C-alpha cells in the first residue's frame, strides 16, 4: 500500500478496507475478516508511526478493536487480549493529549 501516494490517500483506502472487513464480519466470514483487518492494521500502524497525528492514532485504535473482536471469535483469546491491551494503551495516550506511541 506504500505505492498509493499521500498518507491521506492511504488512510482513506484503509478506512474503506475496514468497511469491507465489517461487511465480511457481519456475514460471519471470520477468517476473511481477520485477513482484511490484519492487512489494514499493519498499514494503520505504519501510518501512526510515521504521522503520529491524533487522527492516525484513533484509526489505529479502531483497527485494533476490529481485529481483536474477530480474533476472539476465531478462538484466539490470548491474541485478542493482547490487541485490546495495545488498543487501550494507545487510547490512553490519546486521552492524555500526547501523540507519543
Model-derived segments and spans:
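Flexible helix-coil transition and linker loops at the boundaries of alpha-helical arrays
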Residues: 1-10, 45-57, 93-99
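Conserved alpha-helical positions within TPR/SEL1-like repeat arrays
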Residues: 8-26, 55-72
